[in-house]
Design a protein with these regions (language model features):
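Short, Lys/Arg-rich, polar N-terminal cytosolic tail immediately upstream
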Residues: 1-22
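Membrane-helix interface motif
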Residues: 45-59
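Terminal transmembrane helical module of multi-pass membrane proteins
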Residues: 157-221
Length: 221
């Protein structure tokens, strides 16, 4: 009787009964892997500051240039690690949001677009470690294209995941969804108008902030 009433309660609220993550160890690995990536980025910036690196005058990609710091391969490895560890997260997010909230034609489309864009962003970020400034190609064209693919994929992915969150009924992540809809896109526009390193760092920080909080909710670590 109790079980039956519980099922009916979920049906009445338009929610589906939450399901536990199938692979809890993998879930923890993905979340803590992303957290480690953030720590590695911060550590790299702090160490690089002893060689004159500054967030207000140096772009993110300059961490991967031997003209700026003596250990550019560290940044290349961080990019590859960050892209690899966060790539599977897109599928967990799509699964969790689809299971947790009532499906509609539009929500499924948003989730699919978010997952695909996220994968594109992750693959692009992995290749940022390959086509760093030291291997940027003629006129830095390879690095420029990969950067556009990477950050573009992340921003579009966050937008569609956030759109699904905001439009879902009784979602606990409304504030995070509003953040994802506004802040990354606003920073992209600001960067296009005022191309300064600090805005690029804010953009990377907003992407990492959104993904960390979303991962925490998805994986319940």
């Amino acid at each position: 009787m109790i079980t039956k009433q519980k099922v009916n309660a979920y049906e009445l609220t338009g929610l589906k009964e939450p399901k536990k993550v199938i692979f809890p160890r993998i879930a923890s690995l993905l979340f803590y892997g992303l957290a480690i990536y953030v720590v590695l980025i911060i550590t790299n910036v702090l160490i690089s500051s002893f060689y004159g690196f500054n967030l207000t005058t140096n772009y993110i990609s300059e961490l991967g240039s031997k003209k700026v710091i003596p250990f550019p391969y560290f940044h290349d490895l961080i990019c590859a690690f960050g892209g690899l560890i966060s790539l599977p997260t897109n599928f967990f997010v799509r699964k969790k949001l689809r299971v947790q909230y009532k499906n509609s034609k539009h929500s499924i489309l948003f989730l699919e677009l978010g997952a695909v864009s996220g994968v594109v962003g992750n693959v692009g970020y992995i290749f940022l470690g390959v086509f760093s400034l030291d291997r940027a190609g003629p006129g830095q064209i390879y690095h420029g294209i990969i950067t556009l693919i990477s950050f573009g994929g992340f921003v579009i992915s966050i937008f569609f995941f956030s759109l699904n969150i905001v439009l879902s009924h009784k979602c606990k992540l409304k504030n995070l969804g509003a953040f994802g809809l506004v802040i990354p896109i606003l920073l992209v526009f600001l960067y296009c108008m005022i191309t300064i390193p600090l805005i690029e760092w804010f953009l990377l920080s907003s992407i990492a902030f959104f993904m960390l909080f979303l991962d925490y909710y998805i994986f319940k670590v």
